[in-house]
Regions:
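Hydrophobic/aromatic-rich structural module bridging two neighboring secondary-structure elements via a short loop
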Residues: 1, 5-45
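Ferredoxin-type iron-sulfur electron-transfer modules in oxidoreductases and energy-metabolism complexes
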Residues: 43-203
Length: 203
């Protein structure tokens, strides 16, 4: 893994004293020993989620999250001259909402904290930050549907509104991204339904 020690690569996927990434809502690599009581016993474990199996010792396999990204967490572009970015104005509030979701580091703490092992917060963050920006519009209809389908295929559970994911997220990502994911998924599913012509009866 990256071993960045800056809280941005997500590879420090540990459960500290029963809480994914530790009790201070920061990444494990940014947790200081001074934050704990002198002489206390600290219990460090790997994540426990069926979709993220333990490889060895404290290392878990988070590649399922990468495959969810590969299913739709990208934008398409062409080579050669590109449109002027200034020609695509984005409202400040939309920009802030997109950037608040884009800070997800894919650490998997949300999955480890969820009683269902759900990756809805992670997937919702990726869908939200791309779907709100002009560059993400070409794949918007299919993105959420494809990513949720891959999430299900990887064995992640469904969301039942516990809210533990957002509570432990070191980037403090809001549950609002799950609402966006659900809305976009329904749109994608609706677009896949066959369109039937209404039968007209002869008068």
């Amino acid at each position: 893994d990256s071993d960045c020690r800056e809280g941005i690569c997500g590879s420090c996927s540990l459960v500290i004293d029963g809480t994914p990434q530790g009790p201070h809502q920061v990444t494990s690599c940014q947790t200081y020993m001074r934050d704990f009581v002198d002489g206390a016993t600290i219990k460090v474990e790997p994540y426990r989620a069926s979709a993220m199996p333990v490889i060895r010792d404290l290392v878990t396999d988070r590649s399922a999250l990468d495959r969810v990204i590969q299913a739709g967490g990208y934008i398409s572009t062409t080579t050669g001259p590109q449109p002027n970015p200034n020609a695509m104005p984005i409202a400040p509030e939309v920009q802030e909402q997109a950037m608040d979701a884009a800070i997800c580091i894919g650490c998997g703490a949300c999955v480890a904290a969820c009683p269902n092992g759900s990756a809805m917060l992670f997937t919702g963050a990726k869908v939200t930050h791309l779907n709100l920006l002009p560059q993400g519009q070409p794949e918007r209809t299919d993105r959420a549907f494809n990513m949720v389908s891959q999430m299900d295929e990887e064995g992640f559970g469904g969301c039942t509104n516990y809210g533990e994911c957002s509570r432990v997220c070191p980037q403090e990502i809001s549950l609002d991204v799950i609402g966006m994911l659900n809305r976009e998924y329904r749109k994608g599913a609706q677009a896949r339904k066959p369109k039937h012509r209404a039968k007209m009866t002869a008068q």
